[in-house]
Amino acid sequence: MGKQPIDLLMQPSWRIIDQSSLGPYFDAKQSFAMDDTLCASVGKGESPATARSWVHHRTIVLGIQDTRLPFLEDGVKLLEDEGYRVIVRNSGGLAVVLDEGVLNISLIFEDEKKGIDIDRGYEAMTELVRRMLRPHHAEIEAYEIKGSYCPGSYDLSIGGRKFAGISQRRLRGGTAVQIYLCADKSGSERADLIRRFYQAALKDKSNDTKGVYPDIRPETMASLSELLRTDITVQDLMLALLTELKELSGRLYAAGLSPEEEMVFEKNLTRMLERNEKVFGTQESLD
C-alpha cells in the first residue's frame, strides 16, 4: 500500500507557533521570513515538524509574477487607497488577500527523509482541512477554480466556490505547505478587490500576452461562513487545527524561535525587505 496523505500528518510531535493574534502591526514580510527560517531548521533536523498559524490585517500579498504587471504602480495605489498594505512574497503564484478573517497555516516538514513529492504535501494539507471541517459535513473538493484569484490545482471549494488556496515552498531540506482559509466576511468582495487591482495594473487584457493573470469572477469565491451558513471564525479554525494535530501526533508543544533560528530569521527578513524595496522603491524597517 502506498503512502497516504495522513502519513505526513502523523508526526511523533508537532511544534506549534501560533501567530494568529499578533494584531495589525504584524507584517506579512515577517511571515515569509519565518517560514524560510523554519524550513532550514526542520530540514536540518534541528526542529520537529512545525505548524505555524498566522493572521495579517488588511494586506495584499503579490507573487513575483505580479511585479511584472505593466502598470503595477497604479494597481498598488488602488489597493493602498482602499487601506491595504502591499507586499511581495519570495515565491511564485499571484495576488491574494489577507485580513483578520483569513487564517493562514504553514506545515513545515523535513523533505529528505519523508520523500515528499509535491502532490503529497498538497494532499496532506487538504486532508487536514477536511478533518478540521468534519463537524460541518461539507463536501470539500480540490481542483482549480477558474475565475478565482491565485488559481491552482489544489484550490479548496464547496459547491464550486473557493474558500482556500494552497502553495508550497521548498528550501534547505525543508518543505513549507501554506494555506489561506477564508473564515468569515465576503469572499466575493475580496475577489472583487483583486479584480480591480488587475484592471488598474493591466489597463487592457491585451497587455497580458502570455495569459498569466486571472480573469477574476468574484462570484467564484466565498468564505466558510457564507458556504456553511454558520459563523466560522479564525478562532474556531485554530481550535479545530490544534484538535486534529493532537489526534494525529504523540504530543503538541508551543515553542518560539531558538537563538540560532532568530539569527537566521533576521537574515531572511533582511532579504524580504530588500526584495520589497527593489519592487516598490521604499526603504523600511520593522523594528
Curated annotation (Swiss-Prot):
The enzyme's first-digit EC class, named in words, is transferase
Biological or metabolic pathway of the protein: Protein modification; protein lipoylation via endogenous pathway; protein N(6)-(lipoyl)lysine from octanoyl-[acyl-carrier-protein]
- Superkingdom of origin: Bacteria
Q: What is its EC number?
A: 2.3.1.204
The GO terms this record gives for MF are: lipoyl(octanoyl) transferase activity
> Could you tell me which InterPro entries the record lists for this protein?
aa-tRNA-synth_II/BPL/LPL, BPL_LPL_catalytic, LipL, Octanoyltrans_LipM/LipL
Listed Pfam families: LplA-B_cat (PF21948)
According to the UniProt entry, where is the signal peptide? none
Note whether Transferase occurs among the keywords. Answer: yes
Q: What protein name applies here?
A: Octanoyl-[GcvH]:protein N-octanoyltransferase
